[in-house]
A protein has these predicted regions:
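A short, glycine/Asx- and small/polar-enriched loop/turn
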Residues: 39-43, 148-151, 217-219
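Active-site-proximal substrate-binding core of FAD-dependent oxidoreductases
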Residues: 182-227
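A short acidic (Asp/Glu
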Residues: 57-59, 166, 203-207
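Predominantly flavin-linked oxidoreductase catalytic cores and closely associated redox partners
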Residues: 13-130, 161, 178
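A conserved beta-strand/loop capping segment in the N-terminal third of enzymes
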Residues: 1-14
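A conserved mid-domain beta-alpha-beta active-site/ligand-binding segment of alpha/beta enzyme cores
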Residues: 225-235
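A conserved active-site cap/scaffold subdomain adjacent to cofactor or substrate pockets
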Residues: 130-198
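Tryptophan-centered motif/residue detector
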Residues: 1, 91-94, 141-142, 149, ...
């Protein structure tokens, strides 16, 4: 769809992008295990991007979303006719189909309290003509109560929050986090106001995604009945 002048849609490989940035020579890179950032890192500001596994769960709220598991697979051949990410509704949720330079990636998202894993695998592999599943990941949908913790630490990436990838909102959220961090660090706004701004953004993303489930799909199944029943307040 058309984008605003200041927006664009891109495909990129996160690992390769990270390698380009870290190898650019613009940054001093130190590889070490960090347990307590504020005690172990000498800097004015710390951006904590350690991911979802190091979180203090008392600082997080759950987001409303019907999904919690994804099966991953890949076809090791380029599809020249596929030039965009497909989002395909299935009886148990939906599947992303992403074109890569030399392959196509698949992700079958479902709720493991509604659909058994083997049932999901069988539907995934048969529906998309796949030979095998490469990985299975369970996830939570969540947001931090405060994006600034301690004296000088800003939560970023999955350390701040995560919501399922239906609208591919992660990069936009990370950019908004940077903007809010800047505003707080340089006293454009108070950190309390910045925190409220980024939480409002996350709630907007939650509601945008919930819109997709409100009217269901062509499938009359337990998953879609559950998804349609989720509390939803777009205001």
């Amino acid at each position: 769809h058309p984008f605003l002048w200041n927006d664009m849609g891109i495909h990129f490989v996160p690992k390769k992008l990270s390698e380009v940035v870290l190898d650019s020579g613009f940054f001093k890179v130190s590889e070490k295990i960090i347990d307590d950032p504020e005690k172990e890192i000498d800097s004015n500001v710390i951006f904590d991007c350690r991911g979802r596994h190091n979180r203090d769960l008392d600082n997080y709220d759950k987001l409303i979303d019907p999904l919690n598991t994804v099966l991953l697979s890949k076809k090791f051949k380029r599809d020249n006719n596929l030039i965009y990410t497909r989002c395909v509704a299935t009886p148990n949720g939906w599947t992303f189909v992403i074109p890569n330079q030399d392959s196509v990636s698949y992700g079958y998202l479902y709720n493991n309290t509604i659909t058994k894993k083997q049932e999901a695998i069988d539907d995934f592999t048969s529906r998309f003509d796949l030979d095998y599943v490469t990985d299975t990941l369970e996830f939570d949908n969540y947001v931090a109560k405060n994006f600034k913790i301690g004296e000088r630490t800003i939560l970023q990436g999955n350390m701040y929050g995560f919501i399922e990838p239906l609208e591919a909102t992660s990069v936009g959220l990370y950019h908004k986090l940077c903007r809010c961090a800047w505003d707080g660090i340089f006293n454009v706004h108070s950190f309390d106001q910045c925190n409220q701004n980024i939480r409002n953004k996350m709630m907007e993303l939650q509601n945008i995604i919930l819109w997709h489930y409100q009217y269901g799909s062509k499938y009359d199944t337990p998953f879609w009945n559950y998804a349609k029943s989720l509390p939803f307040n777009p205001d």
